[in-house]
């Protein structure tokens, strides 16, 4: 039925995506949807939001942000951009003027897409982007954008992104998990250890937020990870560094010997100075 179709060419596809699959409180068919459009054509945000509304459903969208970036500058593509940004189209066109770099303008696209789903569903939507660099130049090629209503799904996808990213980045609101094939074919040592800088940034954030408190490492992670792109491994390393700096004390309650000072576990109790 769908083999020779793309979203937008057949109304039955939109109808399928907008179907409520719940029986009472439960979704009979929790599903994962991967959208790989031709650039940006066929991305109907309101339709996809109806799919995401069903419990357990999650979405990956493969985005050619370069083409979206260009289309936002050309009024001829306004109908397509209005399908992509049904609420924030005018806002994103205006806000782009105040972004000084291409990276900031591309991140504005990602952030506004996340806002679209959250506004339409009137519910918390977690979104995370994975960036692909061009093969032959130092520029962004595509993003994969993941959307979920589940904090657990948000946790899991960040772990997967971290496993595949090969570019050290600092999560500063512009940069995200990144893969650059050039680093495989022509590996060059980075001038700065961006991964270490990223951990130090998280470490300082955690200490500022939890100084003087006591809680399990799991509860800290569960509470704090929903606020940003850092994954479970980042938190474990950052907490161990705080422990080595004597800024927190770690105690295990499971009566087992552990080779590390902190694990993201309910059995690992943290007491911050």
Describe each region flagged by the PLM.
Residues 1-218, 222-273:
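Class I S-adenosyl-L-methionine-dependent methyltransferase catalytic core
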């Amino acid at each position: 039925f769908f083999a020779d179709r793309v979203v937008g060419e057949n109304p039955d596809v939109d109808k399928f995506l907008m179907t409520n699959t719940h029986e009472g409180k439960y979704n009979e068919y929790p599903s994962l949807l991967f959208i790989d459009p031709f650039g940006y054509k066929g991305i109907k945000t309101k339709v996809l939001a109806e799919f995401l509304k069903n419990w357990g459903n999650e979405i990956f969208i493969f985005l050619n942000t370069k083409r979206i970036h260009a289309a936002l500058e050309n009024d001829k593509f306004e109908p397509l951009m209005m399908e992509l940004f049904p609420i924030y189209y005018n806002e994103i066109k205006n806000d782009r003027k105040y972004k000084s770099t291409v990276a900031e303008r591309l991140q504005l696209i990602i952030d506004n897409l996340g806002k679209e789903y959250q506004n339409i569903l009137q519910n918390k939507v977690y979104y995370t982007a994975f960036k692909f660099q061009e093969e032959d130049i130092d520029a962004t090629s595509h993003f994969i954008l993941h959307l979920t209503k589940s904090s657990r799904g948000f946790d899991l996808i960040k772990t997967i992104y971290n496993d595949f990213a090969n570019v050290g980045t600092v999560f500063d609101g512009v940069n995200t998990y990144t893969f650059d094939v050039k680093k495989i074919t022509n590996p060059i040592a980075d001038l700065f250890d961006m991964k270490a800088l990223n951990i130090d940034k998280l470490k300082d954030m955690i200490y500022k937020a939890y100084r003087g408190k006591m809680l399990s490492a799991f509860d800290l992670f569960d509470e704090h990870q929903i606020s940003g792109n850092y994954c479970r491994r980042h938190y474990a390393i950052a907490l161990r560094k705080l422990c080595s700096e004597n800024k927190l004390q770690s105690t295990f309650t499971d009566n087992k010997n552990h080779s590390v000072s902190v694990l993201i576990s309910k059995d690992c109790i943290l007491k911050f100075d």
